[in-house]
A protein has these predicted regions:
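Mixed-charge, glycine-accented linear interaction segment located at domain edges/termini
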Residues: 125-177
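Glycine-rich loops and low-complexity Gly/Arg-rich segments
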Residues: 75-78, 106-111, 144-147, 154-158
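Beta-strand secondary-structure signal
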Residues: 80-84, 118-120, 150-154
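Acidic, glycine-rich flexible loop segments
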Residues: 103-141
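Charged, amphipathic alpha-helical segments
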Residues: 85-108
Length: 177
């Protein structure tokens, strides 16, 4: 059995969540990655990439007679990919921040923009982490004197009940050739 370290980031893709049509497999993931509509992030600014899962929150209920805990509720923490795109075009800015992007300009949308993407990360040790449906919040951020696009992509529960909120695959399971 292969050991997983899941260190760093080698590749990062984003796609329409509707492309995940059922329980995600390595074969379906390969098809999504090869789809011309799937885009690759070409630049992630140094030391900004991470995947974090918040600690679950728990509520304990005590028996008033004994003061012992007799029941506990748990709420799982959010899972989030975070990164800053250091170099980008205006179409990429629009894909993550909303608004309208062209080859030579970007215009911010009025009001709140809700953006959802299928996020696909490949680590340096060739492990794929996939959020089939993620809520994307992005903003302008200053990194080392340049304005990047700071992105937080939080895994959501997909609409299709056959699809999980997070998947991991060894690259040997994913055909991208």
């Amino acid at each position: 059995m292969a050991k997983v370290i899941a260190v760093g980031i080698k590749k990062l893709y984003y796609a329409d969540p509707a492309k995940v049509t059922g329980d995600l497999t390595g074969t379906l993931l390969g098809t999504i990655i090869k789809d011309p509509a799937t885009k690759q992030v070409e630049n992630i600014h140094q030391d900004t990439w991470s995947i974090e899962e918040e600690e679950p929150s728990t509520t304990e209920y005590r028996n008033q007679l004994t003061n012992g805990v007799y029941r506990q509720d748990t709420e799982m923490g959010n899972i989030q990919m975070s990164f800053t795109i250091g170099q980008y075009d205006y179409e990429t800015k629009a894909a993550f921040m909303g608004g309208t992007g062209s080859e030579t300009s970007w215009k911010r949308a009025r009001g709140v923009t809700r953006i959802e993407k299928c996020m696909i990360a490949m680590t340096e040790d060739n492990q794929y982490c996939v959020f089939p449906k993620a809520s994307v919040i992005a903003r302008n951020t200053n990194n080392d004197g340049a304005v990047g696009i700071g992105v937080a992509a939080a895994a959501l529960e997909p609409d299709n009940t056959a699809v999980s909120s997070e998947y991991w695959f060894d690259s040997s399971e994913v055909d991208v050739e």
